Amino acid sequence: MFMTYQPKKRQRKKEHGFRKRMSTQSGRNILKSRRQKGRKKLTA
């Protein structure tokens, strides 16, 4: 067995970053709900 999580900063930002979230309606809904909840960090 090997470790399946091989972290990459660029890939993480591309998939879960702020601009990616803003690009779709559902992504904006995610940000909205996280703001309402009072999350310190909205995105990765």
UniProtKB/Swiss-Prot annotation:
Ordered alphabetically, the record's keywords are: Ribonucleoprotein, Ribosomal protein
* Any one Gene Ontology BP term: translation
Family under the similarity heading: Belongs to the bacterial ribosomal protein bL34 family.
Q: For the region Disordered, what residue ranges are annotated?
A: 1-44
Q: Which GO terms describe its molecular function?
A: structural constituent of ribosome
- Tell me what organism the protein belongs to: Clostridium beijerinckii (strain ATCC 51743 / NCIMB 8052) (Clostridium acetobutylicum)
Question: Which Pfam families would you find in this protein's record?
Answer: Ribosomal_L34
What protein am I looking at? Large ribosomal subunit protein bL34
Basic residues compositional bias: what residue ranges? 7-22, 31-44
NCBIfam families linked to this entry: rpmH_bact (TIGR01030)
Q: What is the lineage of its organism?
A: Bacteria, Bacillati, Bacillota, Clostridia, Eubacteriales
User: Looking at the UniProt record for this protein, which Gene Ontology cellular component terms does it annotate, in alphabetical order?
Assistant: ribonucleoprotein complex; ribosome
